[in-house]
């Protein structure tokens, strides 16, 4: 399946496949689009389609939502037949001998992605700069949604946010919600564990500044790596290459450039163009690019926001993005997503990441058979892992190793089952997890980093974690009684009943 170049090709491909519906009646961007999308995304699979709202009140831009909101649509957007193909491609890429330590392997992983020659292609003439607004750019021109009744404002929810390490120039592309404060400023909700926040911390260290709530007159935007200016340039791309949109959402290792990774996914380099008012590059095929800067000394109260947990995340202080320019296509499509109680569109983006990273986890933990992060666990609350158990404490070893692996450190509950268990069958997992554990022996309780959005944590970003060893116990575990044999019908009788099934009249 060929890679898609931009959002327009995705719309055309989805419409051709019968997986997109155009809504031609007027709709409000205040709550109405959310309710429509929520019903569609949680409805029967045949009615769960991408939506293109052509007449959004207060704007002449059509709004695209739920484009990635099902496994088949996301696979189409990424140029694969199924999401499992992502993992298969990574497994082939990693079918080489890597060095021994965890840190060395992650560094080598970045090199492997570079070796596929998927680096960005620089262009000077870009669709995202058909219209350039630098005199009086205004966020009011965008049909930004208010999604839920108690949201603190309107939010941009599907951005690719480009930042740079001020020392090395290393790029990061992340996806963070952006609250519209006014026509020229946004709340930059990059959480403390994310790449954008790390670049902000590095900017503080590099410039010797400390954050505070209120900023003075906006300073000049830094010109590049090594520049002593006290702010960091930021570019925000809306739309563009679907592979890059996905890559921005994925928790990639620091050594992997999201733009290169997207190029590897799509089989050719992503086209990038120099921004007009800041020294960063943006994807040439984007619909809209917001150029500006974040002053690490400035904070403003951001939120609340109806989040993917199904609850409102609390209002907290976050950095502020200042707009210096808007560049866009002549007739742009505004892409957005709705987050809320799962399953929503973001669940499928997370599912793609799960499938993609299984072979990477196996590279470091060869005993892992499969992983499932079900919708009910909203990514970080529940991770189910099947393993080839070989020695006492093996399940605990896997739990602690996973908690030490990048953003998996935020996982609240890890359930480990035996290799023959289908981790995607929640009924089977629950049956085995409740039947195979002795709470005194098989539960591991500890404390560690938690997701910013975890409202039940002991304190913000830190709390308890639970590991459950739901594997069968036997001689390896020195149990006091014999482990019972599982009830299974004989193959002979199963084959007999299969042959005679029509005879029974059932």
Where are these regions (language model features)?
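Extended, highly charged
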Residues: 1-208, 227-506
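Intrinsic disorder/low-complexity segments
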Residues: 207-228
């Amino acid at each position: 399946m060929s890679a898609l170049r931009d959002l327009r090709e995705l719309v055309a491909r989805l419409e051709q496949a019968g997986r997109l519906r155009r809504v031609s009646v007027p709709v409000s961007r205040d709550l109405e689009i959310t309710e429509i999308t929520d019903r569609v995304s949680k409805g029967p699979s045949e009615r769960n389609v991408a939506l293109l709202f052509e007449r959004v009140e207060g704007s002449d831009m059509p709004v695209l939502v739920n484009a990635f909101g099902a496994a088949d649509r996301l696979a189409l957007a990424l140029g694969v037949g199924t999401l499992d193909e992502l993992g298969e491609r990574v497994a082939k890429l990693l079918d080489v001998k890597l060095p021994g330590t965890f840190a060395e392997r992650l560094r080598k992983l970045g090199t492997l992605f570079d070796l596929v020659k998927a680096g960005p292609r620089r262009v000077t003439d870009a669709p995202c700069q058909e219209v350039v607004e630098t005199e009086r750019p205004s966020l009011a021109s965008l049909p930004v949604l208010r999604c839920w009744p108690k949201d603190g404002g309107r939010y941009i929810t599907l951005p690719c946010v480009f930042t740079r390490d001020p020392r090395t120039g290393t790029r990061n592309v992340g996806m963070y919600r952006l609250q519209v404060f006014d026509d020229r400023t946004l709340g930059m909700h990059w959480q403390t564990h994310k790449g954008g926040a790390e670049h902000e911390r590095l900017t503080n260290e590099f410039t010797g500044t400390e954050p505070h709530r209120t900023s003075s007159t906006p300073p000049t935007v830094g010109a590049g790596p090594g520049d002593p200016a006290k702010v960091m340039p930021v570019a925000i791309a809306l739309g563009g290459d679907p592979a890059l949109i996905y890559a921005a959402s994925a928790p990639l290792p620091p050594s992997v450039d999201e733009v290169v990774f997207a190029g590897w996914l799509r089989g050719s380099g992503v086209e990038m163009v120099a921004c007009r008012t800041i020294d960063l590059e943006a994807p040439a095929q984007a619909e809209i690019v917001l150029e500006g800067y974040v002053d690490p000394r400035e904070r403003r109260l951001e939120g609340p926001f109806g989040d993917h947990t199904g609850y409102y995340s609390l209002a907290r202080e976050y950095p502020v993005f200042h707009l210096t320019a808007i560049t866009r296509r002549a007739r742009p499509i505004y892409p957005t997503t709705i987050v809320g109680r799962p399953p929503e569109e973001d669940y499928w983006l997370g599912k793609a990441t799960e499938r993609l990273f299984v072979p990477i986890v196996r590279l470091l933990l060869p005993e892992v058979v499969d992983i499932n992060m079900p919708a009910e666990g909203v990514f970080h609350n529940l991770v189910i892992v099947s393993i080839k158990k070989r020695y006492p404490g093996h399940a605990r070893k896997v739990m602690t190793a996973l908690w030490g692996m990048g953003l998996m450190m935020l996982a609240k509950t890890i359930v480990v089952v035996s290799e023959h268990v289908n981790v995607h069958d929640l009924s089977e997992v629950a049956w085995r997890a409740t039947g195979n554990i002795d709470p005194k022996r098989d539960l591991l309780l500890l404390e560690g980093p938690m997701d910013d959005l975890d409202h039940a944590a002991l304190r913000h970003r830190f709390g308890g974690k639970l590991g459950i060893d739901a594997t069968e116990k036997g001689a390896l575990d020195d149990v006091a009684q014999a482990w019972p044999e599982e009830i299974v019908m004989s193959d002979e009788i199963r084959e007999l009943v299969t042959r005679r099934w029509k005879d029974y009249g059932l």
